[in-house]
């Protein structure tokens, strides 16, 4: 099985710092990222799906780390890269 190299957008890095300050359990995020980096299947509790109606996140997916904490990511298959695009609450990222 091929592992994807993990890359972080600048927006993601800033958002991650915010999640840490808010006391989020970053281990939950790391576990999900590990599964995604191996192109593994997430459990249905993560509600993983492609974002289709949001032009800001073209070709991206989102999954729920917690009920109101999501991770937006995309695969760059030609380069074997998992790009972490953003993280935060649904209302911060998608309810606009």
What would you call each of these model-derived segments?
Residues 1-5, 14, 26, 63-70, ...:
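Enriched for short, Lys/Arg-rich terminal
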Residues 17, 56, 78:
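Residue-level marker of positions within ordered structural domains that often coincide
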Residues 37-64:
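A short, surface-exposed loop/turn module that caps and links secondary-structure elements
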Residues 8-43:
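N-terminal first-folded block
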Residues 1-3, 10, 56-59:
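Basic nucleic-acid-binding interfaces
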């Amino acid at each position: 099985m091929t592992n994807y190299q993990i890359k972080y957008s600048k927006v993601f890095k800033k958002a991650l710092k915010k999640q840490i300050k808010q006391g989020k359990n970053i281990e939950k995020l790391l576990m999900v990222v590990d599964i995604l980096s191996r192109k593994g299947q997430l459990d249905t509790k993560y509600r993983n799906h492609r974002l289709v109606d949001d032009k800001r996140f073209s070709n991206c997916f989102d999954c729920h780390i917690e009920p109101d904490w999501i991770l937006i990511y995309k695969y760059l298959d030609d380069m074997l890269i998992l790009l972490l695009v953003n993280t935060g609450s649904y209302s911060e990222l998608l309810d606009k």
